[in-house]
Each structure stands twice: as C-alpha cells, then as structure tokens.
C-alpha cells in the first residue's frame, strides 16, 4: 500500500473518530468510547477491507448505526471491539480486564454467534439459525450489534465478488430479514430487504426505484392528507399518539408485483402508515 493511501486512510479514520466522539453526550462515556476506539485502531492495524479502507472503519460505522438506534454506550463500546477477539490475537480476558465484564460478555456473544451460527452448514436453514441465534444471544444487545454489523456490510457489499455478494444477500434475505420482523424492527427489515433485492435482482430494483421517483401517485401531500384526519380523530379522544407515514419499500412493491402477477401501475397500496399510541 502506497504512503499516500496510508496517509489518506489515517485521515479518514481520524475524521470518523472525531465525528463519532462528538455524538457521545457525556464526558465519562466519551472517554470510554475513545479508549475503545484507540484499542480497536491499534489491534486492527494493518487490516484492510475490500473497499481499501482500514478494517476499523467498519467498526466505527457499526458504532454510529447503534447511536442512530439510541443504544447505550456499553453497546457502542462493544461494537467498536466486536471483531477484535475474532480477527486479532486479543483474548476475551484482555477485553474484560480493559473494558469490564459487560463489554466482554457482549463481544463474546457476537463472536459465538459468528463462529457457531454462521459457519456451521447445519444451521444455515433459516429456522435452525433463528433458534440458535436467539439461544446464543442471551443479551438482546448481541443481536442488535449483529444487526448493525450486517446492515453496514450490506451497505458496502459492492466491493465484494459477485458470488460473495449473492451469498451474503441471500443469507440476509432468508435469515436477518425474518429475524428483524420477528423482533419488531420494521425499518431495519425493509432496509435489509431493499439492499438484498438490489444485489439479487438489480434490474427489478432499479426499475421499481425509477417508477417510484417518477410516479405522480407518490407525493408527500397525499401522505399528509391521509395522516391528518387520523391525527385529528385521535386527538378528539385525547389519545396521545405518534403517526409515521412513508412510501412502501422497493422490496415490498416488488413482492406485490411478483406475488400478484401485476404491473407497478396496478399496485395501489403504495403507502404505509404506522400509529403508535401511548
């Protein structure tokens, strides 16, 4: 690797690290995250992703996803270290000594899920995997870290070979999507579904994406007009609520087209409204 690439990568990691630390609200938590960052950078030194970026960039991205999901700082610290035991000479006892038993437990959980569930052919079937995954991940935060890890890997999957992309996308579709649905993580479910479809059937993905972007049936006014009377009715009964509206995901529309044998123009349920009451 040339000195210019190394210098650029160092700058990327430095900038990513600064941006991450700015998102940590308290001084105490920020110091713990900073320690984990420095440790991860040191231990992953020399390891490079297929994108050409240092491996630790992935760890930082996963930590940022978890902050987006409002996870606690212990989970964020664990995310920065989630591949250290798996991919370096560091032992779990080292993590416990340096960062405490809670972080070590989460890192251990992620490592076990990766080693046992993902690398065993007998567990590749979705139902078998789900049962094993849930039994291994006794702390829900292990699953959440693994979800964030998979989301980032899917977001950067373009750097892998075609065969590897297909394999990971299919695994995501058959295992992670149903698991996200089972745990009520609706947004993550459709994010992973869309990213999987993009890998498995790019032509269909781009076709539907283009039609969504150009369709006169999809606009914010229609969505707002649908939400307004619902909000008004709930307010009249003094029911506290949050109402979220969005367009149906590309993968959801694709599924309707495939299952019903219809064209995009014949699909009318293009919006989704979620009502959360207090």
Give short role names for the model-derived ranges.
Residues 1-272, 277-278:
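Active-site helical microenvironments for divalent-metal-assisted chemistry
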């Amino acid at each position: 690797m040339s000195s210019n690439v190394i210098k650029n990568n160092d700058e990327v990691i430095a900038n990513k690290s600064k941006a991450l630390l700015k998102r940590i609200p308290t001084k105490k938590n920020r110091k713990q995250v900073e320690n984990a960052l420095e440790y991860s950078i040191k231990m992953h030194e020399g390891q490079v992703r297929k994108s050409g970026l240092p491996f630790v960039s992935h760890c930082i991205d996963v930590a940022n996803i978890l902050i987006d999901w409002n996870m606690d700082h212990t989970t964020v610290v664990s995310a920065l270290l989630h591949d250290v035991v798996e991919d370096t000479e560091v032992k779990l006892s080292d993590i416990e000594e340096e960062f405490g038993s809670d972080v070590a437990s989460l890192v251990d959980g992620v490592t076990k899920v990766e080693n046992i569930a993902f690398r065993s052919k007998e567990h590749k079937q979705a139902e078998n995997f789900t049962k094993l995954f849930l039994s291994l991940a006794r702390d829900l935060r292990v699953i959440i870290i693994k979800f964030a890890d998979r989301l980032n890997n899917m977001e950067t999957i373009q750097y892998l070979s075609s065969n590897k992309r297909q394999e990971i996308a299919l695994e995501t579709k058959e295992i992670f999507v149903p698991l996200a649905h089972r745990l009520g993580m609706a947004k993550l479910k459709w994010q992973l579904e869309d990213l999987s479809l993009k890998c498995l059937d790019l032509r269909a993905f781009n076709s539907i994406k283009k039609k969504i972007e150009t369709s006169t049936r999809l606009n914010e006014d229609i969505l707002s007009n649908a939400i307004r009377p619902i909000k008004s009715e709930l307010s009249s009964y003094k029911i506290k609520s949050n109402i979220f509206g969005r367009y149906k995901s590309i993968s959801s529309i694709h599924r309707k087209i495939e299952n019903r044998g219809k064209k995009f123009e014949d699909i009318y349920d293009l919006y989704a409204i979620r009502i959360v009451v207090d």
